[in-house]
Amino acid sequence: MRRGTCLLRGTTAISPGEKSPVEKSPDEKNPDMTDQINAPFPRPANAIRQAARLSVAPMMDWTDRHCRYLHRLLSHEALLYTEMVTAPALVRGGALHLLDHSPQEHPVALQLGGSDPAELAQAAAFGAEAGYDEINLNCGCPSDRVQSGAFGAVLMKSPDLVAECVAAMRAKVDVEVTVKCRIGVDDQDPQEVLPVFLERIAAAGCERVTIHARKAWLKGLSPKENRDIPPLDYDIVHQMKAEFPQLHISLNGGVASLDEALPHLERGLDGVMIGRAAYHQPSDILSQADPLIFGTGSATDPVAVVGHMLGYIDDQMAQGARLHQITRHMLGLFAGRPGARNWRRVLSEGASRPGADTRLVETALEQVTGIAA
């Protein structure tokens, strides 16, 4: 893949009133991206912690490599996560292709699912060798399929096992090992179980944790319902930061804008993780993240980002990808802007058709730029 074909800072900003030149930029137009590619991988832990001030949640079927590439165009700084990859798939199934990613995605973390310490340690080693900046253990997913493998949110019931898993992974890799968890499951009292859980994993060497501020119900609720029905309890996450000041703690759950994220940072949390809002309205979240959350650079323009996606799409299609596998992540780029509906319609109706290529994306973009011009 030709490096540096994406727009970040260091290129000319395009104002909302101008048409974007839809071009595939050469490397020399994107010095910031070139520097990012040439930076050492994995990144130092302090750099990853800074990136974790705002992160995009790992989301099954959504945060694949194409999604992450798009998100990196929108924010130079935010920490990105893979979809959950199961340790058995890597260790027993040999599915190392699941670790494929582009160098432009960094900083990027690999989320693992599993409950066997030795197997997780080996999977973590594969992830570190692949160049991921962080290995994250999933202790929050409530789906039946995940529970059947004895991992995900059900691990909230086994803090000692989680600690053993963390210790085994840390012994195997040099990159930071982190945990994503809930505040509890089923009838557990979060005030009782969450401090014990954090104490155990901290003793095992975990220094950074992301807490989804809801309980998970392992029976009776679907994964989607578990994201909405259990009530949010932000206060307990802030309480855990006060009780465990040595831990880097990020909050996840229900945060739908940067305006909602900022108060949590101002109250003392180390980071905020945003999920569905970052996927469905990526421009509203990620294009503004660098100046508002990190105090760096300026907002990125989604029209220009589309132009710079064209080279990536060409490269990926030459390697066998289909257009819709990439453009499905781009549907929300112009949410709330004139032309957004037609942008989505052109891509949704045409991207799966035989012969569809970047010309369709250019046609879709005209639905936006033609109105904005």
Show where each model-derived region lies.
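Active-site beta->alpha loop and helix N-cap motifs at the rims of alpha/beta catalytic domains
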Residues: 107-178, 186-190
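Glycine-rich tight-turn/loop motif centered on a GG-T
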Residues: 144-161, 191-192, 220-232, 293-296
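Alpha/beta catalytic cores of nucleotide-metabolism and tRNA/nucleoside-modifying enzymes
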Residues: 28-50, 54-60, 167, 172-174, ...
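Glycine-rich, positively charged N-terminal anion/phosphate-binding segment
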Residues: 34-44, 59-133
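Non-cysteine beta-strand/loop elements that form the S-adenosyl-L-methionine
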Residues: 82, 134-143, 204-215, 274-277
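Active-site-proximal loop/turn and secondary-structure-junction residues that shape catalytic pockets
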Residues: 86, 114, 141-143, 183-187, ...
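Conserved, mostly hydrophobic/aromatic
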Residues: 56, 71, 83, 110, ...
